[in-house]
Amino acid sequence: PTSWWENKVAGPSALLLYLGVRGKIDELDHHTLLYTKDWKSNFAEVFHAPDGNRKVPNPASLYICNPSKTDPSVAPPDHENIFVLVPTAAEPAIGQGGINRSGDEKLEAAADQVIAQIADWCGIPDLAERIVVRRTMGPADFAGELNAWSGTALGMAHTLGQSAFFRPKNMSSKVSNLYYAGHNLVPGIGLPMCLIGAELVYKRIVDDRSASAIAELKPIK
């Protein structure tokens, strides 16, 4: 029920940018992390901004992935395949993204700020004009497309009362044979944790009480 979520704390959401860029970008390695000097203020915008004042931080601490740096097959010849993740508050009102600037105006403006920041901080002055494909995704996309509570990208925050065995269990206490797996549950957020969560559901169903990983999937009867 909706009331169950009222006292829960959502983890961060994100502004995501998927960029196809003409020409090679020697300034970016496969992984690049950019941090603002005012760390405390930057992350306060992500975790503690009041309702009605939640937005994409500017400047922002962010992550850049340039997979074509090590695997040229993920981009056309003489192009780069760039992914950018900017942590934001879990607030759908921050906006919805789209393809080639078709998203909400304020979210696309925030994406422009991020691109300008990367260009400035990494020494790529012509980055914006070299972008040939652009897709953005914001908290409203997580809420609308993925049904993510509060538009979070990471599920329930790992506060003390929402960590480890304090997180929701993987089996319903009200509906027989209803099981759950995902980032809101035990053991936690992130793709590896979600896969482990699915493994724990399987082991519960087949009554496997071992501590080791599954060696072979067995039919569920």
Predicted region positions:
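Mid-domain catalytic core of redox enzymes
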Residues: 1-76
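Flexible loop/turn segments at secondary-structure boundaries
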Residues: 25-27, 70-73, 90-93, 140-141, ...
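C-terminal structural cap/anchor segments
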Residues: 84, 98-135
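Acidic/polar loop patches that form or flank catalytic/metal-binding clefts of enzymes
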Residues: 26-32, 124-131, 210-216
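A glycine- and small-residue-enriched flexible loop/hinge segment at structural boundaries
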Residues: 79, 87-97
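C-terminal structured subdomain/cap of oxidoreductase catalytic cores
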Residues: 1, 5-10, 14-26, 79, ...
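Core structural elements
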Residues: 66-68, 82, 87
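A glycine-rich dinucleotide-binding beta-alpha-beta segment and adjacent secondary-structure elements
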Residues: 57-65, 119-187
